[in-house]
């Protein structure tokens, strides 16, 4: 925040986009529970803050592909924000239009009228929290590995490894072909795993196998 504000104070006009797609999925007490968007909105007149949210993640409706965009800025009055909203609506109509209307309608109905909506959401959060905790402990057991280094993680659905100069795509293919494990290669040097889709009793074995696969390739 300090760095962004200092640049804004120098006279630069800044657009800052806050990716809040996983907002609310915080598993550690010390994790910041407020979005940077909140602070950016009131930080400086030269800052336009944009927040992207995703019901797909935050409401745990995987596959619905529902997103939201919110604008804020200290220098923007209602007239300016209304104009920006109309421009955004025009862009949406000219591109994706209302292609996800069924998903939007289903989610809205559940949020308004679902008798067990909050209870179901809490149950799913607790499930993700438990998987996260097991995943974190499993990764910590391999902290001395020279071939994979886990990036810090404390929220959301995923975690990732730095492949320490080796090819993440090579490891991805090796894990898929030999162990039927699916992972994502990010820019050739990062391998992402989704603990959200793994049963808790299989997470330890998953992590052990990923490290084993890396050792087979690079040691």
Functional labels for PLM-detected ranges:
Residues 3, 106, 134-138, 174, ...:
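Amphipathic alpha-helical segments that form well-ordered structural scaffolds
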Residues 1-64, 68, 77:
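Active-site pre-lysine segment of PLP-dependent enzymes
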Residues 45, 173-219:
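PLP-dependent enzyme catalytic core of the Aspartate aminotransferase-like
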Residues 101, 108, 121-136, 147-162, ...:
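Conserved glycine-rich beta-strand-loop-beta hairpin in the small C-terminal domain of fold type I
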Residues 22-24, 55-59, 74-76, 112, ...:
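Short, solvent-exposed loop/turn segments at secondary-structure junctions
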Residues 41-126:
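Conserved core segment of the aminotransferase class I/II
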Residues 19, 67, 107, 128, ...:
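Generic structural signal for small/hydrophobic residues in well-ordered secondary structure
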